[in-house]
Amino acid sequence: MPKRVLTGTVVSDKTDKTVVVLVERKVKHPLYGKIIRLSKKYHAHDEQNAYHEGETVRIEECAPISKLKSWRVLEKADKASAA
């Protein structure tokens, strides 16, 4: 099974080797049809502490690293789109 890859914004980089990434998605309400923005925060592993608050990054699902971390940062999202 392929690993899930999500794109989001780093909202916290205060912990060592960890960043908190906010991922937003839009869904349509099943009854009323209104488009709703839903968001979720993921703790992602950042080995070199290379990513900082406000940056847009891509994260990939991985084996659990700790109680909260089962994602790791792949790269900056703007760098990925330029390549």
Curated annotation (Swiss-Prot):
GO biological process entries: translation
Record carries keyword Iron: no
Hydrolase among keywords: no
Gene Ontology molecular function: rRNA binding; structural constituent of ribosome
Keywords noted in UniProt: Ribonucleoprotein, Ribosomal protein, RNA-binding, rRNA-binding
Pfam families linked to this entry: Ribosomal_S17 (PF00366)
Top-level lineage group: Bacteria
GO cellular component assignments: cytosolic small ribosomal subunit
Self-association state and partner proteins as the record states: Part of the 30S ribosomal subunit.
NCBIfam families membership: PRK05610.1 (NF004123), uS17_bact (TIGR03635)
Function: One of the primary rRNA binding proteins, it binds specifically to the 5'-end of 16S ribosomal RNA.
Family: Belongs to the universal ribosomal protein uS17 family.
Name the UniProt record assigns to this protein: Small ribosomal subunit protein uS17
